[in-house]
């Protein structure tokens, strides 16, 4: 299932992680579970496409259509 209206932010980092957020269209956001963080299988089923290693790490209650992802930086890039 592919959705053209999924928006992917630029990636940004801190000392330990690389981050990005993904904004879903309203009709797709209705399928986001409210009780738990999604597994990779769940967010891929929604049509989110990104490389391996990304983890859905936080639910932002006021804007549940925005998915927050992170993945560890390689050791040589950690500050």
Swiss-Prot record:
SUPFAM superfamilies recorded: Cell cycle regulatory proteins
The keyword Cell cycle is annotated on this UniProt entry: yes
This protein's GO CC annotations: cyclin-dependent protein kinase holoenzyme complex; SCF ubiquitin ligase complex
Gene Ontology BP annotations: cell division; regulation of mitotic cell cycle
Gene3D superfamilies the UniProt entry points to: Cyclin-dependent kinase, regulatory subunit (3.30.170.10)
Molecular-function annotations in GO: cyclin-dependent protein serine/threonine kinase activator activity; histone binding; protein kinase binding; ubiquitin binding
Keywords, comma-separated and alphabetical: Cell cycle, Cell division
Signal sequence coordinates: none
Cross-referenced Pfam families: CKS
SMART domains reported in the protein's UniProt record: CKS
Physiological role: Binds to the catalytic subunit of the cyclin dependent kinases and is essential for their biological function.
Family: Belongs to the CKS family.
Protein name, as recorded: Cyclin-dependent kinases regulatory subunit 2
Gene source species: Xenopus laevis
